[in-house]
């Protein structure tokens, strides 16, 4: 299992534009082979700052999503005008357990 942590801040008044892109990608990502889940959190301390955590079956699944044409269009739009800053971390899960 692989986790992708995407931390980002949007430029002023660009959060709505980001969430429009998210809506365009929702159906696409759900049909992506190896996709497990995605969650997004807004910072209470820093305005227009978010963290998105997606879970994938394996590294190949993440690589395929990165190459997805619609995703690439959204990435480029984000880099050009939506994001003030961003950081992406990709990590392999070596342990996963819980009470459920």
Regions found by a protein language model. Name each.
Residues 1-49, 57-67, 83-100:
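Short S/T/G/P-rich N-terminal loop/turn motif that feeds into the first structured element of a domain
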